[in-house]
C-alpha cells in the first residue's frame, strides 16, 4: 500500500511542476526508486549521529514538516507568518528510502530547522518514543509521510539555482496548502493528554512554575534587614569566585557575615555625630581607673596617711566563704567591687567600711557600701541638712502667713516624729551606692521614721535611678533614694546576726543607757571570744544573735513620745486630763537577742541553717539563710562571720500584696443647730403652730389687762 501510494503522489507533483523542471531534476526524481535500496543502510548509518543530536535539541519534526520548512521559514518572501504547524505533531515511521533522500536532497533545510527550533524554548518529548506511539495508533499516516518524503527529495532547490519564476512560486503555494490540510488531519488524531498547539506560550510547564515559585521565595525581602536571600547568595558566590579562597566551605559563614557587613552604612542625617560607644565599653573605660596604681586624683597625701589600716574590708576573703555556701557575685565582679570600695575609702575619711550587698533593679542594680565616718567628719554634712530643713520650714510658714485666714479646722494632724540623730538608731551608719564598679559613689540621705512606716505598707521595684519618683498609696515622702535607704534600714535590722559572744556590752556605759532609754544601743567586740563549733551553729539558733537594733512601729529604734507638750499647755490642761491621750511606751527586742525568739511566718521558721558541705563536714562552714527577707545570708566558721544580701529588697509575704484601705473620713468642722438643716413643716403643723402662738398672745394680753385693772383699784 505504501509503495503504490508514493509513486502516485510523485507523479502528480511532477505534472504540477510542468515546465519548471530541468533535465537534472528528472534524474534526481527517478533515481531513488532504483538506487536507494542498495545504499539505504550506509546512509542511515551516516545520518544517525546527526539526527540524534537534532532530536535532543529540537522538536520531533516529521518529514512532512521538514518539507515545508523552507516555505514557512523567515526566508520565504511570500509568507508573512509561519505555518500553523503543531510543535508536538506525531511523526510517522519513514521508509528506509526516506533518510537517504533527506540527507541528499535537503541539507540546508535541516540547518534552517535547527535555527528556528530553539526559539520555542519549550521542552518536548523524545521523537523516537512519540513516533513509536503514533505508529501503533495511526498507521494510515505512514503513507502520507512517505509521500511527503519523496516530494521533499524531488523538489527543486531555488537557493542552489539562484532563480525563481512565477510557476515555481505557484507550485509552492499549492504544495503549502496541501501540507496545511494534511497537518490538520494529522492533528485531529492527537492524544487528549498532550497540550494544544501553541499552548506552551500561554500555559508554562510545571517545571517553569516550580522554578518561578522558588525564585520568588528567594527574592522575598526580610522585614528586619531589607535584603533578600537571592541577592545575598549571589553576592556570596561572586565574592567566592573573585577571591577564590582555600577551603571555602569552612569559611562560608564568615563570608556570609562579611557580605552582610558590607551593606551597613552610617546615618548622615544627624546634626551631631552619634555616640556609638556601647555601655559595656563605656563602663570598661571607667573601670580602667580602678586598676591604676599610685596616687588618685583629688586625694591629699595627708588624708592617705591618716586612713586607718582596717578601713578597707577583705571582700575577697568573704567572697571565698560565701562561694562555699553557694552565694556570691562571681570572682570578676567581686574583685571590681573590692577595688571600688578601695576607691571609696581612699577619697573619704572613713573609719570602717563593709560591703553590704547588692539590690537588684529593673534597669540598673545598686551596689551598697556601709561605712562609718571618723569622729567629727560627718558633723558638717549633718549641719547642712538641718539648715536646709529649717529653710524649708521657714518658707512654708511665710506662705501660711500670706494666705487669707480660713475657718479653723478641728482636725489635728498627728505630730511628725523626728528622725534619729546621726550614729544612733536607724541612722547609725551611712550608706553609699553605685550602679557599677567604677561609677561614682552616691551618699544616701538619712532615713526618717515616716519613710520607714510607709515603706512597710507598699511594695515597689527599684529602677536603678535614684531620682525616680515613687508613685504609690499611701504616698511615699521622697524619691527612690529615700525608699532605698528605708529598705536598707529594714533589712539590716532584721537580718544582721552574729555568733553568740562575738559582741558584748560596755561595762561602764551599759547601766546608764539602760536607765536612760530603757535599753542598750551600743556594743563592742569581745576580745576573749574563742569561737563556737560549726556544728553547734547549725543545730541551734540560740547561738546566733541580732547585733542591730529593732525598728519600732513608729519608724524609730528609740521610742519617741509624740504627746509631749509644753509646760504652759500642761498647766492649762492639768485640770482636764484624759487617759485617752496616754500612749504606752513601745519597747523592742534588746540588742544581742538570740534569733530563736523571732516569730514564725505561718508555721515557717524565720531562719534556715545548713552546712556548706556534707561530704567534708570537718572543713565546712555554717550557713544561715533568712526566710523573712529572701536573699539575706550569713556565714560563720566558728570565729569569723559576715552578712550579705542580694535580692530585690522585698520582704516575704505569704499572701499576695494588697494595698491598704483608705482611712475613714474625718470630721473637719463641728455640726451645730445653727447650721443644721430641718425639714419644712406641713400645713397642719403650721396651723397648729399659729393657733398656739395666738393662744399665747391672747393669754399675754389677758394678763396685761388684769394687771392694769389691779393697778387702777390700788389708786382708788
Swiss-Prot record:
Q: Biased composition, Polar residues: where in the chain?
A: 140-156
Give the chief site where it resides. cytoplasm
Any single biological process term in GO: epithelial cilium movement involved in extracellular fluid movement
- Tell me which UniProt keywords the record has, alphabetically: Cell projection, Ciliopathy, Cilium, Cilium biogenesis/degradation, Cytoplasm, Cytoskeleton, Disease variant, Kartagener syndrome, Phosphoprotein, Primary ciliary dyskinesia
Q: Biased-composition ranges for Basic and acidic residues?
A: 8-25
Where composition is biased (Acidic residues), the residues are 375-389, 506-516, 701-716
Asked if Phosphoprotein is a keyword of the record, the answer is yes
What CDD domains has UniProt attached to this entry? DD_CrRSP4-like
Q: Which is a Gene Ontology cellular component entry for this protein?
A: motile cilium
Q: Name one Pfam family in it.
A: Radial_spoke
Tell me where in or outside the cell this protein is found.
Cytoplasm, Cytoskeleton, Cilium axoneme; Cell projection, Cilium
Q: Would you say which domain of life the source belongs to? A: Eukaryota
Where Phosphoserine occurs along the chain? 396
In which tissues does this protein get expressed?
Answer: Expressed in trachea, lungs, and testes. Very strong expression is detected in nasal brushings.
Compositionally biased region (Low complexity): 29-42, 54-66, 80-100
Cite the InterPro entries for this sequence. Answer: Radial_spoke
**Region listing for Disordered, in residue ranges:** 1-164, 375-410, 506-526, 697-716
Where are the annotated coiled coils located? none
Q: What does this protein do?
A: Component of the axonemal radial spoke head which plays an important role in ciliary motility. Essential for triplet radial spokes (RS1, RS2 and RS3) head assembly in the motile cilia.
Pathological association = Ciliary dyskinesia, primary, 11: A disorder characterized by abnormalities of motile cilia. Respiratory infections leading to chronic inflammation and bronchiectasis are recurrent, due to defects in the respiratory cilia; reduced fertility is often observed in male patients due to abnormalities of sperm tails. Half of the patients exhibit situs inversus, due to dysfunction of monocilia at the embryonic node and randomization of left-right body asymmetry. Primary ciliary dyskinesia associated with situs inversus is referred to as Kartagener syndrome.
Cite the record's note on assembly. Answer: Interacts with RSPH6A.
Question: What family classification does the UniProt entry report for this protein?
Answer: Belongs to the flagellar radial spoke RSP4/6 family.
Protein name, per record:
Radial spoke head protein 4 homolog A
Q: Which organism is it from?
A: Homo sapiens
